[in-house]
Amino acid sequence: MQTLTPNADIFHAKRRRFTCNTHTSTLIPTKPLSVSPARKTNKEHLRNLENVLRTSSNSIDHIENVTSRQEKTTKNTSTSSLLGGLNLARIWPQMKAAVDEMSPKNLKRLQRLLSKSSEERSPKSKLGSKWRELHGLNNWAGLLDPLDENLRRELVRYGEFVQAAYHAFHSDPEGSPRHVALPDGSFKVTKSLYATSSVRLPKWIDDVAPDLRWMTKQTSWVGYVAVCDDPREIRRMGRREIVIALRGTATLLEWSENFRPNLVSMPEPKPDQSDPTRPKVECGFNSLYTTGDQHAPSLAESLVGEISRLVELYAGEELSISVTGHSLGAAIALLAADDIAERVPHAPPVAVFSFGGPRVGNREFADRLDSKGVKVLRVVNSQDVVTKVPGIFADNDKQGQSRNNGRSPGGIMEMVERNNPWAYSHVGAELRVDMKMSPYLKPNADVACCHDLEAYLHLVDGFLASNCPFRANAKRSLRKLLDEQRSNVKVLYTGKSLRLNRTFHDNGDVLPSPSSS
């Protein structure tokens, strides 16, 4: 009858004949041995157990002192083989999380995410007829929480169209026309878009700061219209897509328009100015969208004209119109979608995908968009204050609750919404992300970071569901986030980005936990 050692079931012999390494033991001969089957199992268990007892203290020290370069230099070889051969989670359950975070796989993944040359994207799926659901056919019911993987990819793609608009403007603020480097080579730009402010500044301001003249220009480039012209991509998406991308606030006059928060009535064929239930929108946003001058038509006229041309050009094809924007661009996107649905003959399905957008109009404006079949999906960061203005309600959830309670006859909130010039309402469906869910960003990130478009795309790429942690296999590179929001990235990763190559070679399989700082 065999006598088994305690915990012998943990260790399994890999072969029946083997030669020990240079570390000798009185229990283990240094020459190959042939033993009888009856004694073979016990001897192999003893060998494995003796190896573990001899090296266990070293392995514990290695785990507890993962940042000690001197210790790793002397013990790296033996420790690496031990970590690879033992089930540490079973021997020391409390070390499971630490071992997972220290794995070479995680370190290599972080190296890839921080690399300047690495820009990995999630693989695209064939959408086919599913594109209508992703475009809001059912108001994204069942697709937001948890977030559908195809919708996640689409949102990141739309955000990158807006980033291209930002880059095209800031690379040459005074240039016209300008080149737009699209993130998707299957699309081509068909029209540049310009917005004109109705605010006038004194001419002497240009003389004081001639190098910043672009900041005070009456008319500025705000985005573009692009259309997919790649047959293969059209087949993948299930239709030919027209994209309208609009950047956020950049010039002094655009900022001044942002601070005109009173509601104004939208143009109608036979307006009734005394009707308190008329659709109304923010004065400044409406001004930028509808104002033109002798040098350039209004953004509204330019956009409606181009979309009408494209719809006629591709008549008979399956089409869709996607309007996307960030910040000010998100606000103008709603006005543009409403205008297209109203004025473009035979308009295809229109959907808005916005990031960090403010409130734009009253409840009647939201109802008007819904009645026209315009679908709106707003991506909102819980810490972004821009999404909570303008308006008299600081908490949008309480706003909706108060509104429902105020629909009774003589309800106070109903009266406030109809008669107060600051009674704003959000539009459409909402995907809410949270800065605190990111393992890379500081939970107390500043206001600018909470509103930053790259931070939004980072959060969307890592979002699984409201009750789930950040996606472990997120593909989006952290390089741009580091470049633009370094002060808001956890110190661990700003340091790692500077010392990445050296750290990778020196530290081998060691990586601290993402949540440790």
From Swiss-Prot:
Main localisation: plastid
Pfam families: Lipase_3
InterPro entries reported in the protein's UniProt record: AB_hydrolase_fold, Fungal_lipase-type
Position(s), cross-link Glycyl lysine isopeptide (Lys-Gly) (interchain with G-Cter in ubiquitin): 43
Enzyme Commission code(s) on record: 3.1.1.-
Functional description taken from the UniProt entry: Acylhydrolase that catalyzes the hydrolysis of phosphatidylcholine at the sn-1 position. Has a strong galactolipase activity toward digalactosyldiacylglycerol (DGDG). Hydrolyzes triacylglycerol (TAG), but has a low activity toward phosphatidylcholine (PC) and monogalactosyldiacylglycerol (MGDG).
Inducing or repressing factors: Not induced by wounding.
Reported consequences of knocking out the gene: No visible phenotype under standard growth phenotype.
Record-level Gene Ontology MF annotations: galactolipase activity; phospholipase A1 activity; triacylglycerol lipase activity
Similarity section: Belongs to the AB hydrolase superfamily. Lipase family.
Organism of provenance: Arabidopsis thaliana
Transit peptide start and end: 1-36
GO cellular component annotations of the record: chloroplast
Tissues and organs where the protein is expressed, per its UniProt entry: Ubiquitous. Highest expression in flowers and seedlings.
Subcellular compartments: Plastid, Chloroplast
Protein's name in the database: Phospholipase A1-Ibeta2, chloroplastic
SUPFAM superfamilies: alpha/beta-Hydrolases (SSF53474)
Enzymatic class: hydrolase
Domain of life: Eukaryota
UniProt KW keywords: Chloroplast, Hydrolase, Isopeptide bond, Lipid degradation, Lipid metabolism, Plastid, Transit peptide, Ubl conjugation
Any one Gene Ontology BP term: lipid catabolic process
Active site residues of this protein: 327 (acyl-ester intermediate), 384 (charge relay system), 451 (charge relay system)
